From Swiss-Prot:
Coiled coil: none annotated. The lineage of its organism: Bacteria, Pseudomonadati, Pseudomonadota, Gammaproteobacteria, Pasteurellales. PROSITE patterns: ATP_GRASP, BC, CPSASE_1, CPSASE_2. ATP binds at residues 116, 159, 165-166, 201-204, 209, 236, 276, 288. Keywords: ATP-binding, Biotin, Fatty acid biosynthesis, Fatty acid metabolism, Ligase, Lipid biosynthesis, Lipid metabolism, Magnesium, Manganese, Metal-binding, Nucleotide-binding. SMART domains: Biotin_carb_C (SM00878). It comes from Haemophilus influenzae (strain ATCC 51907 / DSM 11121 / KW20 / Rd). It comes from the Bacteria. This is Biotin carboxylase. The active site is at 292. Acetyl-CoA carboxylase is a heterohexamer of biotin carboxyl carrier protein, biotin carboxylase and the two subunits of carboxyl transferase in a 2:2 complex. NCBIfam families: accC, PRK08591.1. This protein is a component of the acetyl coenzyme A carboxylase complex; first, biotin carboxylase catalyzes the carboxylation of the carrier protein and then the transcarboxylase transfers the carboxyl group to form malonyl-CoA.
């Protein structure tokens, strides 16, 4: 087993990693910025090292400082958590080159899955369903383009190869508009990105966001741990997550889950990972793979009984996964609300001192947070201050428990988005289950 781990992160995930290390008897090193001296995990770690000033670029993204911290403390591994350097292939490479274990996949796999084109190619090869498309840029041959569009099926979306941020995209609903739309998107792409290459993809009108949790070890084993539904989003940021996803049968779960597990073996994956899909009309379409632990991992832990962070540590130590696929049984239902220090109406961050905190409790209630009474939420980082997770035998029980838990929570001194969560949980369509990724923004009157 690993002997000493550097926790290269902050906030609730750093505390989550510390708890798993302690349970496994692993010593911990907390690296922190000058703004984070009073973080809960910093107060609890075996050793602490300040790695720089408050801005992330000078601390949590400071690769030489993090590796130096591992060297001076005699650590044998570094856990990147999520965000920051967790999906930075250069960091993973430098960690391993410096003689430490990176708790995550290899740098090559992070690179492969971090590039959209190579990731989709690898997934198609491994039998994971992807969004049907033109398999590369379209030509000027309109007859051929019409043929491709017909094969994909309308509506389609034309995207600029060099595009991003919502620019250089056009939805086409019929063949009549195809030629003109391609020409217009090409012209836009040339003007905006100096690259007029465009490609076609099937346009999904009202998809849900469904993702599959996987674990893979260095002994050729890979397992899937059911799915999560993260469709309740605002500005592409997940707000509420749940597991399992409403309406997904065991048969469907087994099919898509085993494809993801097989893909892990194909690409030589190791550690915890998540395959993200758009799900519409009973079909899954791969969008990307997250090569790290995710914010919403607790809902999977609640329904499977697996400690995902402990498995990450075991795998990094060279041990096989501690269970087999057939041992995994989905039981009950779990929900997670991301509690942010922000104004519930304007969504602007609300840093400051937490004068008083009362966290909820009771059967099936889990509170993952680094915040305590007297703690000051700094303005430099992500606004998430807690994750409230509830579990019940049924989805209805999990929702009711979440409503109770939210009403019990007292966070005095700063504003939080708890009113937004209360609004979502009492929404009739959310209670039925299966709302799509646009639902919350439409409800908030945000659809642009």
């Amino acid at each position: 087993m690993l002997e000493k781990v550097v926790i290269a992160n902050r906030g609730e995930i750093a505390l989550r990693i510390l708890r798993a290390c302690k349970e496994l008897g692993i010593k911990t090193v907390a690296v922190h910025s000058t703004a984070d001296r009073d973080l809960k995990h910093v107060l609890l770690a075996d050793e602490t090292i300040c790695i720089g000033p408050a801005p992330s670029a000078k601390s949590y993204l400071n690769i030489p400082a993090i590796i130096a911290a591992a060297e001076v403390t005699g650590a044998d591994a570094i856990h990147p958590g999520y965000g920051f350097l967790s999906e930075n292939a250069d960091f993973a490479e430098q960690v391993e080159r410096s003689g430490f274990t990176f708790i995550g996949p290899t740098a090559d796999v992070i690179r492969l899955m971090g590039d959209k084109v190579s990731a989709i190619k690898a997934m198609k090869k491994a039998g994971v369903p992807c969004v049907p498309g033109s398999d590369g840029p379209v030509s000027n041959d309109i007859a051929k383009n019409k043929e491709i569009a017909k094969r994909i099926g309308y509506p389609i979306i034309i995207k600029a190869s060099g595009g991003g941020g919502g620019r250089g995209m056009r939805v086409v609903r019929s063949e009549d508009a195809l030629e003109e739309s391609i020409a217009m998107t090409k012209a836009e792409a040339k003007a905006a990105f100096n690259n007029d290459m465009v490609y076609m993809e099937k346009y999904l009108e009202n998809p849900r966001h469904v993702e599959i949790q996987v674990l893979a070890d260095t002994h050729g084993n890979a397992v899937y741990l059911a799915e999560r539904d993260c469709s309740m989003q605002r500005r592409h940021q997940k707000v509420v997550e749940e597991a399992p996803a409403p309406g997904i049968t065991e048969e469907v779960r087994r099919d898509i889950g085993s494809r993801c597990a097989n893909a892990c073996v194909e690409i030589g994956y190791r550690g915890a990972g998540t395959f993200e899909f758009l799900y519409e009309n009973g079909e899954f379409y791969f969008i990307e793979m997250n090569t790290r632990i995710q914010v919403e991992h607790p809902v999977t832990e609640m329904i499977t009984g697996v400690d995902l962070v402990k498995e990450q540590l075991r795998i990094a130590a060279g041990l096989p996964i501690s269970f087999k696929q057939e041992d995994i049984k989905v039981k009950g239902h779990a929900m997670e609300c991301r509690i942010n220090a922000e104004d519930p109406k304007t969504f602007l961050p609300s840093p400051g001192k937490v004068n008083h905190l009362h966290s909820p409790g009771g059967l099936g209630v889990r509170w993952d947070s680094h915040v305590y009474g007297g703690y000051t939420v700094p303005p430099h980082y992500d606004s998430m201050i807690a994750k409230l997770i509830t579990y019940g035998d049924t989805r209805e029980v999990a929702i009711r428990r979440m409503q109770n838990a939210l009403s019990e929570t007292i966070i005095d001194g700063i504003k939080t988005n708890i009113p937004l969560h209360e609004l979502i949980l009492e929404d009739e369509n959310f209670q039925k289950g299966g709302t799509n990724i646009h639902y919350l923004e439409k409800k908030l009157g945000m659809n642009e």
